[in-house]
Amino acid sequence: TVAGLVLVITLTGSGCAAVEPEKRVYPLALGAGVSENGFVLKYAMPDMSTATGQEKPDEDPISVLTLSDFQEIEAVYNRSQEKFLDLGHLEVLILDEQILEEGSREALIGYLKQEEHIGEDVYVFRTDMLGDVFHWKGARESSIGEYLQGIQENRTSGQQKKGVTLREVYHQFCQDGTLPWLPEIWVEGELLEVDYGSNE
C-alpha cells in the first residue's frame, strides 16, 4: 500500500516531466505584443529540418496566438496543439513597444512570473517590428532565437554584448514598476540590427 501511494505521488507530482521529449516543442524565442484583439504571444521553434537535414517546407516554425489574456492564450495552445509547450529552453524574450506601456507590462510580468520554467537568465529585447523580426532568417537559416543567443554568448570575452536579462527586468519592476532600457532589434533588408545603446 505504501509503495502504491509513493507511485501515485511520483506520477502526479512529476508534471511535465512525464511528457516524453519527442512529444514536446522547445521554443528558443518568445515574443509578446498587443494587437486590437488583445495580447499576442509568438513562439519561435528551432529549425529542426536544418539540424536533421530533413526538409519540411509545410511546417511554420512560428506559432502565433492572440487572445484577451496570457493565461487564455496558453490554455488555447494546450487544447489545440499536439505537442507539450516546454519553455525551459527559452533563450530570448522579444517585446513590442505597446506591451512596454503601463497596464500591459503589468499583465506581462505577472504572466512571466507564474511560468516557473522560464529562467531569469533569458535575454530581453524590444522591437516595433515583431512580425518581421520573428520571420527573419539568418545566412545559415538560423532562427531569431538562435541568432540572438549567438550574439550574446558565442563571442570572445572582449566581443560579448551586455544584454538585459529577465532577472534585471524583474528587479527594476519590483523597485518602481518600470522596466530597464532594453536593447532594440529591427530588420533592415536582409539584416537583423541590434542596438545595445551604451552597453555595447
Residue ranges and their predicted role:
Residues 2-200:
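Membrane-proximal alpha-helical signals and transmembrane carboxylates
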